[in-house]
Design a protein with these regions (language model features):
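Bacterial N-terminal signal peptides
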Residues: 1-3
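Aromatic-Pro/Gly-enriched surface loop or interdomain linker
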Residues: 6-66, 70-73, 171-172, 178-206
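Loop/turn elements at helix/coil->beta-strand transitions in domains of secreted/extracellular proteins
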Residues: 10-12, 62-66, 90-94, 118, ...
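Short alpha-beta junction capping motif
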Residues: 14, 66-105
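An acidic, glycine-rich "communication" segment
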Residues: 21-22, 30-31, 104-180, 188-197
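Surface-exposed patches in mature extracellular/periplasmic domains of secreted proteins
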Residues: 45-55, 97-100, 118-126
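Alpha-helical scaffolding within the catalytic cores
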Residues: 49-56, 78-84, 148-152
Length: 206
């Protein structure tokens, strides 16, 4: 079982994953804060909505049941980080990765180091995450238009549990950020926040 040290008084929090390689792991720090506030307002989940980040090499990684990773550029995990992230995920931790455009090749390369024999699988629209709280019958929303490719969602499973969820060409976390950051419409932002709520509810329900 995953030991949630930091979830005092039953509160749920998210930690942004800090990684090496040059990618902007830190972009849009308002994203998680806004998502967690939305979750608290629309579900019975009690949250700690502070912005928090953690390095893979830190013992603090095991204090968070949910890690969030995003960015535009390169990602590099050291051998020690690969082992620690694998241990975290195998012991019940959950990682959500949102490609903010330009992250795909690096994410796939580095996650293959973590799970060499466990590849990303594209999730069908019938998968439970897409209807666990709000209904997304066509899968991930297209929040931020980078090009004309369809939004897609991928997963890595450990003993039938979704341990890693990865959105590509979707970018819902842009819709979580403060409205002035990306100028997404109110409708797009609400859709993105609802989708993020589904991810959290699904991660907690497994």
């Amino acid at each position: 079982m995953f030991s949630v040290v930091a979830q005092t008084e039953g509160t749920f929090s998210i930690a942004r994953l800090k990684y090496d390689g040059g990618g902007d792991w830190y972009n849009d720090p308002s994203a998680e804060v806004n998502l967690l506030n939305f979750v608290q307002q629309n579900t019975n989940i009690k949250v700690d909505a502070r912005y928090q980040f953690v390095e893979i090499s830190s013992e603090e990684i095991f204090s968070y049941p949910f890690l969030f990773m995003t960015g535009h550029g390169n990602v590099v995990f050291s051998e020690d980080e690969v082992e620690r992230l694998r241990l975290y995920l195998e012991n019940g931790g959950f990682l959500y990765i949102d490609d903010d455009y330009g992250l795909d090749n690096a994410v796939r390369r580095e996650m293959k180091k973590v799970f060499p024999a466990n590849k990303f699988q594209e999730l069908p629209f019938s998968y439970g995450l897409y209807s666990v709280f709000y209904n997304f019958e066509n899968g991930p929303p297209k929040t931020h238009e980078h090009d004309n490719n369809p939004p897609r969602g991928f997963g890595i499973f450990i003993k039938e549990r979704l341990a890693v969820y990865y959105t590509y060409e979707s970018n819902p976390s842009d819709g979580w950020a403060d409205a002035a950051v990306h100028n997404d419409s109110p409708g797009k932002r609400e859709e993105a926040l609802k989708f993020g709520t589904n991810i959290i509810v699904w991660a907690l329900s497994q």
